[in-house]
């Protein structure tokens, strides 16, 4: 159950043959996606970030004693469908949908981002976690923890409340997403193995029937 950063902001390709995970950060502008990302990668809270800028970050960590190379795309906050957005929706292996617990509208917009993923991938079975950020601003909270948990149940995904300012829950969110990607890959691999066994059995049955017909001639 461990996760430790081995390198911060690692440029270039993954090293040491680590599995690469393409992660996309989604959420309305101003919810703290960039701050969450920067805290995870460099343990730093940015003083300022332009919410209209999209950027990419890379880091290598260990999760459950397995190396993981994360390629993280921090997107702008507009929940609109564009050609560029379609590309990263299609290429992303896992998604973190963020909202601010101090902004109810950002919570309501979380559903729009979930639908954007569906529009491109045509399935809801995509690794995803829901993150309610800015819990350090408790006095300004507009979205309860229970509401976040309910939405996560609707999404059938893990839910985390975080504070980028205090670096609380940040690692948990990224670890949770990588574990979900691994879980779904493991399930898919199991299904593929079962299908191969069924196909092999079917071929054996057909071969046996063919041999029986030949013996009858």
From Swiss-Prot:
Catalyzed reactions per annotation: GTP + H2O = GDP + phosphate + H(+)
EC number(s) stated in the UniProt entry for this protein: 3.6.5.2
rRNA processing listed as a keyword: no
Biological role stated in the UniProt entry: Binds and exchanges GTP and GDP.
Keyword Transferase belongs to the record: no
Binding site for GTP: 27-34, 74-78, 133-136
Keywords: Calmodulin-binding, Cell membrane, GTP-binding, Hydrolase, Membrane, Nucleotide-binding, Nucleus
CDD domains listed in its UniProt record: Rit_Rin_Ric
Compartmental location: Nucleus; Cell membrane
One GO term (biological process): negative regulation of neuron projection development
SMART domains, alphabetized: RAB (SM00175), RAN (SM00176), RAS (SM00173), RHO (SM00174)
SUPFAM superfamilies: P-loop containing nucleoside triphosphate hydrolases
Taxonomy, superkingdom: Eukaryota
Pfam families, sorted: Ras
Molecular function terms, GO-annotated: calmodulin binding; chromatin binding; G protein activity; GDP binding; GTP binding; GTPase activity; semaphorin receptor binding
Name this protein carries in UniProt: GTP-binding protein Rit2
NCBIfam families: small_GTP (TIGR00231)
Membership in a protein family: Belongs to the small GTPase superfamily. Ras family.
Quaternary structure annotation from Swiss-Prot or TrEMBL: Interacts with AFDN, the C-terminal domain of RALGDS and RLF, but not with RIN1 and PIK3CA. RLF binds exclusively to the active GTP-bound form. Binds calmodulin. Interacts with PLXNB3.
Note: Shows rapid uncatalyzed guanine nucleotide dissociation rates, which are much faster than those of most Ras subfamily members.
Class in the EC hierarchy, top level: hydrolase
Activity-regulation annotation: Alternates between an inactive form bound to GDP and an active form bound to GTP.
GO cellular component terms listed in the entry, alphabetical order: cell body; cytoplasm; cytosol; dendritic tree; Golgi apparatus; membrane raft; neuron projection; nucleoplasm
Organism: Rattus norvegicus
Main subcellular location: nucleus
